[in-house]
Amino acid sequence: TRVRAPRPNRRPGELERVYTEVFAHFTSMIAAGKFPFASRVGDSSSAPRIGDGVVTIDAEGMVRYVSPNANSALHRVGIMSNPVGTSLQELGFNDEPVRHAVERRLPVIEEFEQGRDVTLLCRCVPLLDPDDDGVRGVLMMMRDVTELRRRDRLLLSKDATIREIHHRVKNNLQTISS
């Protein structure tokens, strides 16, 4: 990869600015010894990543930033208004993962159904204050896993059908052999 010096006339966009702020917050947590977190959270291989959709939430629980991918996920669950400046609860969005991350001061990964037949996987990482035990906010990464869960259910249904056919063929063969 190439590293270039920033152009003097170039102003960063909102996405770049927010990601840089999040990076700076994580570096201050690392310097204070508060990141990475001591406990591991489940299987992180399928957990949302920063490119899936990002929502930053401040210490008061108000949405401060929503990335374009997160905005698309919110639209799929029926939230069409601009969420910036409101709480997730006011929007009718499940805010349990955020509350759990703040209460435990540890990352939380939760999958839940939101709206009509939409399944979201959320990873909420508390942004700890490097100077004290407070929480400055939460970084919520979300992924729409509706299609993946639909395929899982379809696979389970096909598996049950194959088991039933196998059972019937086995019974027929036993009848013929006796």
Where would I find each of the regions flagged by the language model?
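PAS-family sensory/regulatory modules and their coupling/dimerization elements
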Residues: T1-V3, S87, F93-E147
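Sensory modules in modular signal-transduction proteins
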Residues: A31-Y65, A70
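Signal-transmission coiled-coils
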Residues: G51-G53, I57, L155, R163, ...
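PAS and related sensory helical modules
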Residues: N71-Q89
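Short post-phosphohistidine helix in the DHp/HisKA domain of histidine kinases
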Residues: V169-S177
